[in-house]
Amino acid sequence: CIVYPNDAFDALTVLQTVQAEKCTGLHGVPTMFIAELDHPDFAKYDLSTLRTGIMAGSPCPIEVMKRVQADMNMAEVTIAYGMTETSPVSCQSSTDTPLDKRVSTVGLVQPHLEIKIIDPDSGQTVPRGATGELCTKGYSVMQGYWGDDARTREAIDAEGFMHTGDLATMDDEGYVNIVGRIKDMVIRGGENVYPREIEEFLYRHPQIQDVQVVGVPDQKFGEELCAWIIAKPGQTLDEAGVREFCKGKIAHYKVPRYLKFVDAFPMTITGKIQKFRIRELMQEELGLSEQKTA
């Protein structure tokens, strides 16, 4: 049976329900799992009946996946990837996917579906291991956007492939890793920087609960990196500490120029983080404007 703890997400209610109902699986977006793991009363609840579940809805941080497996007893947790327009899952790991693949990829393409990873400019399929736009085709792809033929033609090509706008790689075994969004990619001084990579690195900081990285306009480099950071309960962070953590571990141009410590991120009602709002709010706060280009 399926148990709904509440009509809206609340981390404490979820923990209480898992213990009371002896749930074996738990589904949610990454921000929900993070809130549960870092709740002050987390250790008081018995989650030993948990075994599996699904993390999906937005990029799943590797460090969070590891914590879910180790601290929530979800040894068989999986990741699903897709979008509303693809009904929604195109790729998913399984309970028997090797551990290293299960925490770091979205698994393999689902049965009876096709995917390809292409160069967004040329449309050509990229080699294994190279980054490109993930496209998917099959019975799950929508017929189109209601009353919007132009937008439908932009999203679905003549061969029936849905262009997701997500940047991805595929390894030699067919496992897919989502690198980021094409629109989220930051071009700083001619260097392509993927916010997801910076986020994954910062999740390793022992005092960081959650982090989101975006690009903001810059007169000199075109764009600069900005990180919004939520500290773990009871922890205090400052810019100097975060920069020291980054020093010598990632390339200098990948260290965010702007750091902002917040209590929450702007989110949709379904728990997805609104990066565009973070970008807009920072531009307003810093008095930055987009540069006109040829």
Which positions does each model-derived feature cover?
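AMP-binding/adenylate-forming catalytic core of the ANL superfamily
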Residues: 18, 26-29, 133, 138, ...
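Adenylate-forming AMP-binding core of the ANL superfamily, especially NRPS adenylation
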Residues: 59, 99-147, 155
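Acidic/polar alpha-helix N-cap and adjacent early helical turns
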Residues: 280-294
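Active-site glycine-centered loops adjacent to acidic/histidine catalytic or metal-binding residues
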Residues: 57, 82, 107, 138, ...
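Gly/Ser/Thr-rich phosphate-binding loop
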Residues: 15, 20-28, 37-101, 114
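Glycine-centered tight turns that cap/initiate beta-strands
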Residues: 41, 49, 73, 112, ...
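Beta-strand->loop->alpha-helix junctions that form or flank phosphate-binding loops
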Residues: 77-85, 105-109, 214-216, 260
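A short helix-loop-beta submotif of the ANL/AMP-binding
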Residues: 1-3, 24
